[in-house]
Amino acid sequence: MAKDIKFSEDARHAMLRGVDALADAVKVTIGPKGRNVVLEKKFGSPLITNDGVTIAKEIELEDRFENMGAKLVAEVASKTNEVAGDGTTTATVLAQAMIREGLKNVTAGANPMILRKGIDKAVTRALEELKAISKPIESKEAIAQVAAISAADEEVGELIAEAMERVGNDGVITIEESRGFTTELDVVEGMQFDRGYLSPYMISDSDKMEASLDNPYILITDKKISNIQEIIPVLEQVVQQGKPILIVAEDIEGDALATLVLNKLRGTFNAVAVKAPGFGDRRKAMLEDLATLTGGQVITEDLGLDLKSASLDMLGRASKVVVTKDTTTVVEGAGNEETIKARVQTIRNQIEETTSDFDREKLQERLAKLAGGVAVVKVGAATETELKERKLRIEDALNATRAAVEEGIVAGGGTSLINVIPAVRALLSEVTADEATGVKLVLRALEAPVRQIAENAGEEGSVIVEKLKNESVGVGYNAATGEYVDMIAHGIVDPAKVTRSALQNAASVSAMFLTTEAVIADKPEKDAPAMPDMGGMGGMGGMM
């Protein structure tokens, strides 16, 4: 395919038009008085959102060179969302400011490669200062503030703070759509996996359609049980203890399942059978997790263990097990605390080492089931459009809260970026002329988020930026009320990780943009000529 090539100024300015198109659409959403953007969907109702990365992903421009510029900035938003889960609009605003300022300097003759060094030095200094001014987050109230600011909704803030308090920092919090109008929290204590009873005759509560076992023994195996003779020895030992038993196996079928059901109906003993969760290697790992949590052993041929020789000390214990048609929940497993902690640490190490997003998600689920619990935020709304928008905001709030717990908080509303300006300005005396231009470029860009928040609130951005530069550290502009306040004291905070990621990613893409000298795009293909008209086919008039 033929290619279209543009060089130097032509290339950069074509891409800049794309950067501006995307950034201008995204930046209207920043701040408490930011607006929404409506996205057309091929099917269903349009999506109304103020989520930067969602807007950025939707933008496709007709001009291929402009589209490349837009995609570069979309990458900033996407990467920030991946690392911190929020701050995508801030990252986009910073990237646009750096690119515009940098392009002026490159056009005026600055060397882009040395300019890049100046940008890198300035951003490194800014990140050091951000780390120094960040404060750790400890109280439930502080967590609620972070979530409330991100979602622009205090009720959501309270909900997420409660979820994190209930399941801990390692717990899984999932967001689902509710059938009602209200948003509510549902917390599952203990370990839950997606496997239900193998026979409805095993239920103990016909109203709730669930089987509840108090202080049961738990037999865990990766084998398929089809012959009852294999497990009779261990069942006899459990019956002597007068306790119920939960059997977790690859499958239980035929004679074995029929015998368990028959004895349950006769009242001889209470047994519930479920299939093992997961598949393949993940199944083995999940069974090991369950064994660790309950203080039992996985009876597997890999370890030379056989069901016929299983004894009571190989079985796990828990204070309660509840089995429904689709799920099994094990509450208060009797596993050794130290063994559970060691298992948790192993999973944490695997999370850090894995490169697959899918594997990371599954490992985090396993970690939550061992270390914390699972909370489900059920999002309700009057219409489907509102539901989608609300769900996106709650996802952002949850990500922002996790980021805050990880690296602490800084003053919100772009204030922290203004606060690091003096430290970055001090670099000017330490760098060369073109590097100094790169530092000044970053200094100017650090003002951009506050400027945009003010402009979205109908104020003059430059006036507010100058006033904040003369205020003490931590004092910022509350765009919701139009007042200058101590941001942290008023609960207007940003996670340090979000601000850090936004600045780092914006600087990285801006530096790449400014050092671009040629841009190559595919030439649009010409449409093939249409078939000639088939008229004039005489002699066919009689055909019906």
Curated annotation (Swiss-Prot):
GO molecular function, one term: ATP binding
InterPro entries: Chaperonin_Cpn60_CS, Cpn60/GroEL, Cpn60/GroEL/TCP-1, GroEL-like_apical_dom_sf, GROEL-like_equatorial_sf, TCP-1-like_intermed_sf
GO-annotated biological processes: protein refolding
EC identifiers of the protein: 5.6.1.7
Top-level division of the source organism's lineage: Bacteria
Broad enzyme group: isomerase
ATP-binding listed as a keyword: yes
Gene name per UniProt: groEL
Catalytic reaction equation(s): ATP + H2O + a folded polypeptide = ADP + phosphate + an unfolded polypeptide
Family: Belongs to the chaperonin (HSP60) family.
Subcellular location: Cytoplasm
Protein name (record): Chaperonin GroEL
CDD domains per the UniProt record, alphabetical: GroEL
Record keywords: ATP-binding, Chaperone, Cytoplasm, Isomerase, Nucleotide-binding
GO CC entries: cytoplasm
Binding site for ATP: 29-32, 86-90, 413, 478-480, 494
Function: Together with its co-chaperonin GroES, plays an essential role in assisting protein folding. The GroEL-GroES system forms a nano-cage that allows encapsulation of the non-native substrate proteins and provides a physical environment optimized to promote and accelerate protein folding.
PROSITE patterns (UniProt xref): CHAPERONINS_CPN60
